[in-house]
Amino acid sequence: MGMSKSIKVILSLALVVFLALAATKVEATRYITYPAIDRGDHAVHCDKAHPNTCKKKEANPYQRGCEKINRCRGG
């Protein structure tokens, strides 16, 4: 029931590699840095000299809801 020496060596090396990978610090941050926020804050054709081109359009413009007297939702 004894394992051969080569299998023991392979398992030992695999364990060392696994522990080395598990001990490394992951470089992912849990917060957004200021340069990342600044890069994503401008429109595609935004020009610093002409700031009016930097204004974004409203995604969902306001529309009044349906009034009860109009019966636009089935009653």
Swiss-Prot record:
Its main location: secreted. InterPro entries: RALF. GO terms for biological process: calcium-mediated signaling; cell-cell signaling; regulation of growth. GO terms for cellular component: apoplast. GO terms for molecular function: hormone activity. Coiled coil: none annotated. It is found in: Secreted. Residues 1-28 form the signal peptide. Disulfide bonds join 46-54, 66-72. Keywords: Disulfide bond, Hormone, Secreted, Signal. Cell signaling peptide that may regulate plant stress, growth, and development. Mediates a rapid alkalinization of extracellular space by mediating a transient increase in the cytoplasmic Ca(2+) concentration leading to a calcium-dependent signaling events through a cell surface receptor and a concomitant activation of some intracellular mitogen-activated protein kinases. Belongs to the plant rapid alkalinization factor (RALF) family. This is Protein RALF-like 9. It comes from Arabidopsis thaliana (Mouse-ear cress).
